[in-house]
Swiss-Prot record:
PANTHER family associated with the record: RBR FAMILY RING FINGER AND IBR DOMAIN-CONTAINING (PTHR11685)
Homology family: Belongs to the RBR family. RNF19 subfamily.
Source organism of this protein record: Homo sapiens
Keyword Phosphoprotein attributed: yes
Organism classification: Eukaryota, Metazoa, Chordata, Craniata, Vertebrata
Location of region: Interaction with CASR: 660-838
Residues noted as binding Zn(2+) 1 in the record, renumbered to the chain: 132, 135, 155, 158
Sequence ranges of Basic residues compositional bias: 671-683
InterPro entries, per database record: E3_UB_ligase_RBR (IPR031127), IBR_dom (IPR002867), TRIAD_supradom (IPR044066), Znf_RING (IPR001841), Znf_RING/FYVE/PHD (IPR013083)
The EC number(s) this enzyme carries: 2.3.2.31
Tissue and organ distribution: Widely expressed, with highest levels in heart. Ubiquitously expressed in the central nervous system.
Chain positions of all zinc fingers (RING-type): 132-179, 301-332
Residue ranges of the TM segments: 368-388, 424-444
Region described as Disordered: 41-61, 622-685, 700-721
Protein name: E3 ubiquitin-protein ligase RNF19A
Length: 838
């Protein structure tokens, strides 16, 4: 027994010597401790049972006995006793280690239990904090106010800052940062806790509500936010601010300071002029590209007039006012609907400028004409595409659905075949329904919505021409101001921003005329002489109607097209009783209009140095017993010196002695006689290819100018009969064609004469002293005998109590003969002497 124990201990010691790894020792110790906890009785009784090794049967070793081993046997016994004592000591040390590990494990378990208790308490504390979705910080629940309209929560600091920013930028429809639900004003008051911001909020809310009222008018005084709800005050437009200490009087219509002796347009024009002068003097008022904001980037809201800045970042043109909530288009500045950008209004969703008038009209005509063809083409393509495409789409969807599943091929193919067959049956029905509904909708849009939207916006470019049919205007409104600088305009048109004083507001007496003209293709309008632009004057004479309109452009290099339409329908027997309204647009500030006696006289026809000319066609009808009055208006540019031409006629003379004047040369003439009615058609053309005729006319003028006599208007006043005649001879006579006239006589006593007469001067001291040299007046007459001389004609005009009676002496000198196409034309000299009695 003792030998077995010694052998076991020796084997155990050998095992200890072999297993010197501390990790393996610890694992074995843990295993032993576990066995002890399980309550093994055999391990507790034996001291050596602490080490449980598996019983391994080893093969018996063959012993070899030698002579030396016999002599060393005693020494081995002593060594074994020593090893036994060492094994006992090792077992004791291992047991001490086990006891220490057990105590450590118990302490670890105790610390784990205490730490678990601490973690539970910490988790309970962490559960009381919530993360803010705005600042991403964790705060306690009491820092998250409850909102009435939604369940989202944010910390009070973030909400307060959010509300401050929204109110300071006048956005009063404040919604939740995480959804679109709006805040209740009570919640806003509780979160802000700021009386000043709440007053601003309430003021913006009130302003937003009042702006929607069409009868609300805000006081125009600075720093006055008082509003007047003026219901039914259109007939009495004078309003007074009711705020204490203000009392500002303003107009109901234009919403500006009260203007007692002016119309709204005149007051607006005066304000625009003063604003323009201040802008010129102070460069800090006007916005420029250097300051970072262009004038096109700042526009007022069409409803509340609050100024809005649009960033030039390629954003869309659908704008929403932050003050009143008005949705409008940035290009046309009009309140828009859902179909605004789909209709041919010319406004694009992302563009920087609207379409031109020409492009809009072409788009409209193309839509109206090509809509049936386009719709039929779309329907013809859609029907087969739907019939073929729907089954293919259904088959692919079913195949993709069954592709990744454990389904047999037979079942999958059956499902695909069934779906395709069903879709083949259904697809024609779907195509028919789609085309049957879509085609009427498209036709209704093209022929219903498009014309209505165009007529409502006034952008169709089609207007009535004084009962003479339909007129289509192709001139581009947006290109008029090309090349000009930013002009300060007080919500007026470009024409109103210029110096356009309206002189006289009389009725035309039934005389109707329509003449719209813009400058021809000119690159150098400023090449015309300065004396024309500085000394030009427009005469509104009795018996005539001169209507001038300014096209309103500050351009130097402009490319516009001339379009003239004249309707002449008035027939009268006398010359008196007519008045005209003239709008001056010249650069000169001292240009004036004088009402004087006489017939309608012509003005200047300047030509560009590069040969650009203005072409006008006028059709005149006359009857033997009636005389026709013509009225026209021309639209000229600021930099050019083109002047309005007027044609007229005189009556009240004996039959056979009367003469009619014409202000343009005739290029073509024909003889037509229809039942006693005489019809004359003429076309005025100014060309530069008649150099030989120009030289002849210049020689004639030079010879006649030396013989012309200058009559006196009074004892102390200089000549008035020769004003501005040199300009006419230099610009008009130098480029005119040879005059061709024809006349068909209904009776031997009826004669018609055509004359080219220069304009009468304005009676002004500074103009009379600088009047140019005299020029002869060429008269082309065609009578039966070509020898009749006009007698003295008296034209009298009464104005108030003062009578001015100029006497015109007409007599003819030597006749100039010219043969052209077997027609004889006689050019006579005309000398005019004007005498006045005041």
């Amino acid at each position: 027994m003792q030998e077995q124990e010694i052998g076991f201990i020796s084997k155990y010691n050998e095992g200890l010597c072999v297993n010197t790894d501390p990790v393996s020792i610890l694992t074995s110790i843990l295993d032993m401790s576990l066995h002890r906890q399980m309550g093994s009785d055999r391990d507790l009784q034996s001291s050596a049972s602490s080490v449980s090794l598996p019983s391994v049967k080893k093969a018996p070793k063959k012993r070899r006995i030698s002579i030396g081993s016999l002599f060393r046997r005693k020494k081995d016994n002593k060594r074994k006793s020593r090893e036994l004592n060492g094994g006992v000591d090792g077992i004791a040390s291992i047991e001490s280690i086990h006891s220490e590990m057990c105590t450590d494990k118990n302490s670890i378990f105790s610390t784990n239990t205490s730490s678990d208790n601490g973690l539970t308490s910490i988790s309970k504390q962490i559960g009381d904090f919530i993360e803010c979705p705005l600042c991403l910080l964790r705060h306690s629940k009491d820092r998250f106010p409850d909102i009435m309209t939604c369940h989202h929560r944010s910390c009070v600091d973030c909400l307060r800052q959010y509300l401050r920013i929204e109110i300071s930028e006048s956005r009063v429809n404040i919604s939740c940062p995480e959804c679109t639900e709006r805040f209740n004003p009570h919640d806003i008051r509780l979160i802000l806790s700021d009386d000043v911001l709440m007053e601003k909020y309430e003021e913006f809310m009130l302003r937003r509500w009042l702006v929607a009222d069409p009868d609300c008018r805000w006081c125009p005084a600075p720093d006055c936010g008082y509003a007047v709800i003026a219901f039914g005050c259109a007939s009495c437009p004078k309003l007074t601010c009711g705020r204490e200490g203000c009392g500002t009087e303003f107009c109901y219509h234009c919403k500006q300071i009260w203007h007692p002796n002016q119309t709204c347009d005149a007051a607006r024009q005066e304000r625009a002029q003063s604003l323009r002068l201040r802008t010129i003097r102070s460069s800090s008022i006007s916005y420029s590209q250097e300051s970072g904001a262009a004038a096109d980037d700042i526009k007022p809201c069409p409803r509340c007039a609050a100024y809005i800045i649009k960033m030039n970042d390629g954003s869309c043109n659908h704008m929403t006012c932050a003050v009143c909530g008005c949705e409008f288009c940035w290009l046309c500045m009009k309140e828009i609907s859902d179909l605004h950008y789909l209709s041919p209004s010319g406004c694009t969703f992302w563009g920087k400028k609207p379409w031109s008038r020409k492009k809009k009209i072409l788009w409209q005509l193309g839509t109206l004409v090509g809509a049936p063809v386009g719709i039929a083409l779309i329907a013809g393509i859609a029907i087969p595409a739907m019939i073929i495409g729907i089954p293919v789409y259904v088959g692919r969807k079913i195949h993709n659905r069954y592709e990744g599943k454990d389904v047999s091929k037979h079942k999958r193919n059956l499902a695909i075949a069934g779906g395709v067959t069903l879709s083949v049956i259904v697809s024609p029905v779907v195509a028919a329904v789609t085309v049957g509904i879509g085609v009427p909708i498209m036709l209704a849009y093209v022929y219903g919505v498009v014309p209505i939207s165009l007529c409502r916006s006034g952008g169709c470019g089609v207007s009535a021409g004084n009962g003479k049919g339909v007129r289509i205007e192709f001139d581009d409104e947006n290109d008029i101001n090309v090349g000009g600088t930013n002009t300060a305009v007080d919500t007026t048109s470009v024409a109103e921003a210029r110096h356009n004083p309206s002189i006289g507001e009389g009725s035309v007496g039934g005389l109707t005329g329509s003449l719209s003209a813009s400058g021809s293709h000119m690159d150098r309008i400023g090449a015309i002489r300065d004396n024309l632009s500085e000394t030009a004057s427009t005469m509104a004479l009795a018996g005539a109607s001169i209507t001038g309109s300014l096209s309103g452009s500050a351009m130097v290099n402009c490319f516009n097209r001339l379009e003239v339409q004249a309707d002449v329908q008035k027939e009268r027997y006398s010359l008196s009783g007519e008045s005209g309204t003239v709008s001056l647009g010249t650069v000169s500030d001292n240009a004036s209009t004088k009402a004087m006696a006489g017939s309608i006289l012509n003005s200047y026809i300047p030509l560009d140095k590069e040969g650009n000319s203005m072409e006008v066609q006028v059709d005149i009808e006359s009857k033997p017993s009636k005389f026709r009055h013509n009225s026209g208006s021309s639209s000229v540019d600021d930099g050019s010196a083109t002047r309005s031409h007027a044609g007229g006629s005189s009556s009240g003379l004996p039959e056979g002695k009367s003469s009619a004047t014409k202000w343009s040369k005739e290029a073509t003439a024909g003889k037509k006689s229809k039942s006693g009615k005489l019809r004359k058609k003429g076309n005025m053309k100014i060309n530069e290819t008649r150099e030989d005729m120009d030289a002849q006319l210049l020689e004639q003028q030079s010879t006649n100018s030396s013989e012309f006599e200058a009559p006196s208007l009074s004892d102390s006043m200089p000549s008035v009969a020769d004003s501005h005649s040199s300009h006419f001879s230099e610009f008009s006579c130098s480029d005119l064609e040879s005059m061709k006239t024809s006349c068909s006589h209904g009776s031997s006593d009826y004669h018609t004469r055509f004359a080219t007469v220069n304009i009468l001067p304005e009676v002004e001291n500074d103009r009379l002293e600088n009047s140019p040299h005299q020029c002869s007046i060429s008269v082309v007459t065609q009578t039966a005998s070509c020898s009749e001389v006009s007698q003295l004609n008296h034209i009298a005009e009464e104005h108030g109590n003062n009578g001015i009676k100029p006497n015109v002496d007409l007599y003819f000198g030597d006749a100039l003969k010219e043969t052209n196409n077997n027609h004889s034309h006689q050019t006579m000299e005309l000398k005019v002497a004007i005498q006045t009695e005041i």
